[in-house]
C-alpha cells in the first residue's frame, strides 16, 4: 500500500473531522452517543453482517460463472477479509486486491482470475446500485416530495476541460497500447475480458449478481438510517430522506479519506441537516455507523488471523 496515499488520506480525514467538530461541539456529540439505543445499534450491526455475507454470495455466483467451484463458506470467509481491508485501507479497490491475493494463496489459484472475478462482481453490483438509485429517485418523486439538494455552481469550461483530458488519456492508452506493455496488466485485462464473455453466457447468474448488488446497496445505505434512529429523539421525514442515505454511503467510499472518516460525518451534517436533523444527532449517527463498519471489520480480522480451516 502506498504510504504517501495513506498519509494524504489521513490528512484529509483530520481536516474533515476538524471542520465538523469546529461546527458541532464534541461534548454535544458525546452526550448524544451516551443515550444511543442498543436495540437499533444491534440492528445496524446485524444488517452490516448480512450485507457482507450477501456480498460473498454474489462473489460466489461470479466465480461459478467462471467454472471455479470453490467451497462456499471459504468464499464467504474471504469476503469478510475483503470488508476488513476495505475499512482499514482506502476503499473497495484496495480491499479487493488484498482479498484476492490472500484467497489466491489459500486456494492455490492464479491471482488474475480472482481479481477479474472481483472486478466483474463490482461491475455488475454497480449496475444494481444504479437501479437502486433510480428507484429511490422515482419513489421520492412519486410521493410528491422534492429533493432538497443544492448543487454547487461549476464553470462549464472546467467540466469540459476535465472531460477532454480524460478522453485524451484514454485515447493515448488505447492508441499506444500502454497497458499491453505491462505483462501482468495485459494478462489481467485479457482474463477480465474472458470473464465478461463467460458471464454473458450465464444470464441467470448475471441477473442474480445484479439483484444481490441492488439488495446489498439497500442494506448498506440503511445502516446510517438505523444508527440515526438510535440517537434521534424527534420525528423525521424518513420518506423524503431516502435518497440521502445512499448518497452518503457512496461518498464515504471515495478514496480520499481513511475508511470514510470525516467524509461521512461532513456529508451527514450537511445533507441530513436539510431535513431538520439536529447537528449533534447527524454527527453521532455517522460516528456510530463508522463503529458498525469497524466492528464487522474486526470480525473479518479475526477470521483472517484464524486462517483457512484445516481439512
PLM regions and their residue ranges:
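Transmembrane alpha-helix interface/packing and boundary motifs in multi-pass membrane proteins
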Residues: 83-91, 246-261, 265
Amino acid at each position: 500500500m502506498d504510504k504517501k496515499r495513506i498519509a494524504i488520506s489521513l490528512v484529509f480525514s483530520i481536516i474533515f473531522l476538524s471542520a465538523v467538530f469546529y461546527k458541532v461541539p464534541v461534548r454535544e456529540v458525546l452526550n448524544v452517543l451516551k443515550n444511543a439505543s442498543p436495540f437499533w445499534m444491534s440492528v445496524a450491526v446485524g444488517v452490516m453482517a448480512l450485507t457482507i455475507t450477501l456480498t460473498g454470495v454474489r462473489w460466489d455466483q461470479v466465480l461459478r460463472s467462471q467454472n471455479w467451484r470453490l467451497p462456499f463458506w471459504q468464499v464467504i470467509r474471504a469476503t469478510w477479509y475483503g470488508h476488513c481491508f476495505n475499512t482499514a485501507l482506502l476503499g473497495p479497490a484496495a480491499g479487493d486486491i488484498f482479498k484476492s491475493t490472500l484467497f489466491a494463496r489459500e486456494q492455490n489459484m492464479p491471482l488474475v482470475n480472482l481479481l477479474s472475478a472481483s472486478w466483474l462482481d463490482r461491475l455488475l453490483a454497480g449496475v444494481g446500485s444504479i437501479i437502486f438509485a433510480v428507484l429511490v429517485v422515482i419513489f421520492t418523486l412519486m410521493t410528491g416530495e422534492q429533493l432538497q439538494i443544492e448543487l454547487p455552481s461549476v464553470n462549464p469550461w472546467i467540466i469540459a476541460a476535465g472531460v477532454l483530458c480524460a478522453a485524451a488519456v484514454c485515447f493515448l492508452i488505447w492508441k499506444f497500447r500502454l497497458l499491453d506493455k505491462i505483462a501482468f496488466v495485459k494478462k489481467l485485462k485479457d482474463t477480465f475480458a474472458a470473464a465478461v464473455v463467460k458471464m454473458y453466457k450465464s444470464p441467470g447468474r448475471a441477473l442474480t449478481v445484479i439483484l444481490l448488488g441492488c439488495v446489498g446497496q439497500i442494506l448498506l445505505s440503511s445502516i446510517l438510517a438505523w444508527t440515526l434512529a438510535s440517537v434521534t429523539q424527534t420525528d423525521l421525514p424518513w420518506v423524503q430522506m431516502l435518497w440521502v442515505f445512499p448518497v452518503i454511503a457512496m461518498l464515504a467510499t471515495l478514496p480520499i479519506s481513511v475508511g470514510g472518516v470525516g467524509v461521512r460525518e461532513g456529508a451527514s451534517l450537511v445533507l441530513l441537516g436539510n431535513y431538520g436533523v439536529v447537528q449533534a444527532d447527524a454527527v453521532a449517527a455517522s460516528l456510530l455507523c463508522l463503529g458498525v463498519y469497524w466492528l464487522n471489520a474486526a470480525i473479518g480480522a479475526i477470521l483472517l488471523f484464524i486462517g483457512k480451516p484445516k481439512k
